[in-house]
């Protein structure tokens, strides 16, 4: 948590410098909110070898940003996910569970703070097309549940990772000072902590799941 606060303070300082520059140039700043649907990449459960698939999760982001120039803007966003899981039922392939029919579920908790930059690639009368990238700290942990194996379920503690985000989207002005966005983003939030669980006298490694996601979101920007 201390690492996240330290990085957050550094991020805020960098954004503050951008704010001062933007104010000096007479440019506006804005608030934003985004939500949508996301799917995690397929991963393999470390303990059992079962290949996991994602359900649909809801990403939510709130942020504040500044128009640095006519075609470039930057913002600071705080984001999380709602309801995401990697899960699958099947026969385990890893010892000592080989052949056992199990159901595995990994439910992550992800909180990320990103500094993002966006460049307008084209400017049409009705809409703009933009590309962007973001980086910042993410707190990642997960709840691991097994049905069919007793005593293996566990929770991992928070791990501070560096999160990366790539975005391609379009925006259109829908009212004076209000723009709507539709965007695709790829996000890598890194891995959770690994944890050893004692199962019938044997140490079994769980956790260590990597969370990468494909996101389709709609958002609103309000000029202030």
Swiss-Prot record:
Residues 1-22 form the signal peptide. Keywords: Signal. InterPro entries: OMP/PagP_b-brl (IPR011250), OmpA-like_TM_dom (IPR000498). Gene3D superfamilies: 2.40.160.20. GO terms for cellular component: cell outer membrane. SUPFAM superfamilies: OMPA-like. It holds the Pfam family OmpA_membrane. This is Putative adhesin RF_1314. It comes from Rickettsia felis (strain ATCC VR-1525 / URRWXCal2) (Rickettsia azadi).
